[in-house]
Swiss-Prot record:
<comment type="function">
    <text>Catalyzes the formation of CDP-2,3-bis-(O-geranylgeranyl)-sn-glycerol (CDP-archaeol) from 2,3-bis-(O-geranylgeranyl)-sn-glycerol 1-phosphate (DGGGP) and CTP. This reaction is the third ether-bond-formation step in the biosynthesis of archaeal membrane lipids.</text>
</comment>
<dbReference type="InterPro" id="IPR002726">
    <property type="entry name" value="CarS_archaea"/>
</dbReference>
<keyword id="KW-1133">Transmembrane helix</keyword>
<protein>
    <recommendedName>
        <fullName>CDP-archaeol synthase</fullName>
        <ecNumber>2.7.7.67</ecNumber>
    </recommendedName>
</protein>
<dbReference type="GO" id="GO:0043338">
    <property type="term" value="F:CDP-2,3-bis-(O-geranylgeranyl)-sn-glycerol synthase activity"/>
</dbReference>
<comment type="similarity">
    <text>Belongs to the CDP-archaeol synthase family.</text>
</comment>
<keyword id="KW-0472">Membrane</keyword>
<keyword id="KW-0460">Magnesium</keyword>
<keyword id="KW-1208">Phospholipid metabolism</keyword>
<dbReference type="Pfam" id="PF01864">
    <property type="entry name" value="CarS-like"/>
</dbReference>
<feature type="transmembrane region" description="Helical">
    <location>
        <begin position="4"/>
        <end position="24"/>
    </location>
</feature>
<keyword id="KW-0812">Transmembrane</keyword>
<dbReference type="GO" id="GO:0005886">
    <property type="term" value="C:plasma membrane"/>
</dbReference>
<keyword id="KW-0594">Phospholipid biosynthesis</keyword>
<dbReference type="GO" id="GO:0046474">
    <property type="term" value="P:glycerophospholipid biosynthetic process"/>
</dbReference>
<keyword id="KW-0443">Lipid metabolism</keyword>
<keyword id="KW-1003">Cell membrane</keyword>
Amino acid sequence: MNEIVQLFLLIWPPYVANGSAVLAARLRRRHPLDFGKNFLDGRRIFGDGKTFEGVAIGVSAGTLLGYAPNLAYSYLTLLDAFLLATAAIVGDLLGAFVKRRLCMPRGYPAFPLDQLDFLLMALLVYSLYRELHIPLLLAAVVLTPVIHRATNYAAYKLRLKKEPW
């Protein structure tokens, strides 16, 4: 299988998971994952932007839509897509946790946390049970900040995000 196709199939579930979680912002009622609680440092654990609804949307969309191209190419299993999507959401949550500890407000641009946290966690989990080729890893890490910036700008223009980053 072509390495470009493999790269796309590998990064698609985490991209979909990370990108679709923002759709929860459109819901009238959202429930913060941290229940509005603070960490030991007195700051919110994740903040209002990380919700149960966002996790559910992200994992579901990342699994189902992330798996869809594999119906034609058969590279990932449905379980792979689920694990990649779930790990991407966990990576995003870890990034939010770190940003809160660094006193960064919600929506504040923080490279590389915002651009790579979701992908690196997904690839780490994937590498625990399947071989991950270094050229694919490097290509994903190099391309992701550019793709992330472009998709965030599109989400901003569509009024899905408050900031273009």
